[in-house]
């Protein structure tokens, strides 16, 4: 049975691989659409132009996917799964005990902390540069926001509840809402200026939307879209990490309470 299954899998991979290679070898791409795009782009970075100028709706959808992912994490690992009142009554915990915190999270060794802090600072700086320069160089809001969130996660892992780089959960909620709302409002502004939602405009009454050197073509509202996406990704990934961290602390407290009851 196993040999027949392996043979079927091998044949399937062979047929699929041969089909892909055949398609790539005989692929013909009409340059018409490409020429239209390259004629009308106003941003010096092709990749960023694709993400925000030509498929901004798709980028908005990706942001909403991240929103849904964070909401699901909150449902599964957040307060909706654990009723604080029930847990306090069950395990005779004091009223002042808050289960949704990172208190009690242990720290790593001094060597890890010594290396983690400067690395976190450098990652935050790199993330900011990546967001602000995404319309000129490779990068953007997604990459920069992920870098800053990774710096936050690294600092929390190394320092625990005493992390020097800390985002309060309420602050993350506001930051995520600000990023998503900023993206939507910029799209509305484009609709009022150019007649199309998320239309990229470069100036209003002669005033440049985003300042740029004379030798660099202005990018319009795309830098602001990058900032909005960066805030959204930073807050979303950090919130997911926060919820998973709270889950760890909750499980530890429940285990300790069960041991005391036994």
Curated annotation (Swiss-Prot):
The keyword Transmembrane helix applies. One of its GO terms (cellular component) is plasma membrane. Its main location: membrane. NCBIfam families: PRK06281.1, PRK12579.1. The chain crosses the membrane at residues 7-27, 58-78, 114-134, 140-160, 179-199, 216-236. It is found in: Cell membrane. It is a multi-pass membrane protein. InterPro entries: CPA3_antiporter_subunitB (IPR050622), MnhB (IPR007182). Keywords: Cell membrane, Membrane, Transmembrane, Transmembrane helix. This is Uncharacterized protein MJ1307.
């Amino acid at each position: 049975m196993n040999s027949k299954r392996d043979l079927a899998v091998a044949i399937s991979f062979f047929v699929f691989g041969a089909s892909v290679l055949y398609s790539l070898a005989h692929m013909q791409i009409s340059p018409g659409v490409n020429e239209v795009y390259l004629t009308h782009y106003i941003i010096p970075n092709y990749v960023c132009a694709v993400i925000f100028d030509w498929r901004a709706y798709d980028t908005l959808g990706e942001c909403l996917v991240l929103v849904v992912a964070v909401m699901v994490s909150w449902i599964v690992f957040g307060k909706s799964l654990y009723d604080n009142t029930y847990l306090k009554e069950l395990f005779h915990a004091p009223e002042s005990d808050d289960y949704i915190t990172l208190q009690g999270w242990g720290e790593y060794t001094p060597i890890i902390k010594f290396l983690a802090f400067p690395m976190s600072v450098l990652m935050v700086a790199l993330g900011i540069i990546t967001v602000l320069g995404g319309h000129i160089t490779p990068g953007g809001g997604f990459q920069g926001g992920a870098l800053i969130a990774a710096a936050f996660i690294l600092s929390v892992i190394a320092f625990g509840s005493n992390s020097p780089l800390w985002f309060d959960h309420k602050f993350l909620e506001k930051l995520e809402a600000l990023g998503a709302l900023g993206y939507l409002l910029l799209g509305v502004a484009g609709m009022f200026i150019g007649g199309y939602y998320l239309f990229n405009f470069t100036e209003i009454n002669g005033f440049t939307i985003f300042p740029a050197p004379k030798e660099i073509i202005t990018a319009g509202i795309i830098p602001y879209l990058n900032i909005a996406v960066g805030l959204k990704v930073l807050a979303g990934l950090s919130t997911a990490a926060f919820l998973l961290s709270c889950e760890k602390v909750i499980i530890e407290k429940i285990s300790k309470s069960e041991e005391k009851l036994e």
